[in-house]
């Protein structure tokens, strides 16, 4: 059987699955059509997923796990597969975890065979995968060790390429391909210092590596050995690396003479781009280079904050609102982040507030209109910074609203799930207040059951919004949430387990949502804390322990019974879920939940929410998405 064809089918199904999970509104005239489209799409996703799992289970995994060495044909097939999973050209990664295990097997085989050129090829593939995984996991500030793992692997591979670039070793390389791989990846190694914050030693090392690579381009030893190598591109990309050392509001903490050097290199990049704009415009737009130059002039104190702001606004107003590649993401998401950073330094005027409000809307509209197959990875990377630099102010957009609209724009089923959990938890809480108000002591400052009854509406409001925010952390791992085509790997389960802590951290950044952080942090913990995650959080120490238990139950109930957004799986019935609660009473679930869910009034209300209520949520989601779809970006 032609496994090339099978792997190509896997790729095409992945693309279909991603598109089906967040369908376009084109051709949908009514909310009922949207609901049907989603249901049909997820049935189709289930079929596509089964076909992809068969390819992995019957062909790829047995090959990767075999003790036998790969044949030349097998290595070629999975090498081609890995390249298609990581498509750097359009900043899109279709399945990084699978690409990682494929590249590791290829590298392992090449080391055993001792052949240098195949080894270099697969080191090249492996370093690209490491970089993509580092960027993917660098969004998770609360878990630096995850990105650190891939950073270290990438740096070790980079050091191997750098050692081969030394003149004595480089001369021994027998082919132009081997030499090109060494030059390219020794240069690329500096990229593994990205996303480090305030590490002065790393900043010094990064600059030293860049200077060394620049010297290579001016050394006749290398240029004469490689006369056909694109030295112009090599030099341009190095200048690009220099210019990005102050990326995202200079998070790396470059300072003093470093900033001066970076600025001067940015000016070189600007001049080089304009020396042959026809050639370089095929790499990046002029505005991309202009934004880098303006930022580095500002940090080198060669441009005032006001002048930098004006330049950013000029670039933003002239942006291409429908450009969905790296340059488009820079113009439409990164430039607003830099403007947010400036607003933190300059007094927030009414004009600033209006600007921030407009930027918030435009970024969400841009994300909503982004095709599912374009630049998802780079969009999520910049969106993570957007959320962490977001500014709240009275009368402006609240973080909760921003987060929910982002979920709606990128993955409607997760948005509907958040609202369903809020409806279920609030419904259960209302009945709990009536029957056992003492369980809510501690919520909204209540010190007695009588106060709980008096503050009934305030407590329900709290539960509603806390539940809406329970999955906040998922906004930074949407590419893992998109994985429907196969079972999650251990690495992906690890990423999923980060979302409570990441969500709590994001919520704590903003006054309007800080009080919901414990619910986000604890909603995957068992009632008795014997299982669940994060392990270090003991929910019994939280004053909102009962709300955590309500949301945990509501979360499990919606996930178990949803047959629209999760129709690729068979949903449980409400009675089956209640039996599960009885079985786990006092361990997984709060002991009072079993009795509460057994009451006829509660069962009737919850049953309504799981049927008509869920349909209404999809109707409302359609209306919200349609309003974004129909309104032009400003």
Which residues does each PLM region occupy?
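An active-site-proximal "capping" alpha-helix that borders the catalytic cofactor pocket
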Residues: 419-430, 492-508, 573-593
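Acidic/His-rich, divalent-metal-binding segments that scaffold phosphate/diphosphate chemistry
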Residues: 361-494, 537
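Short, charged, surface-exposed loops that flank catalytic or proteolytic processing sites
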Residues: 487-488, 565-575
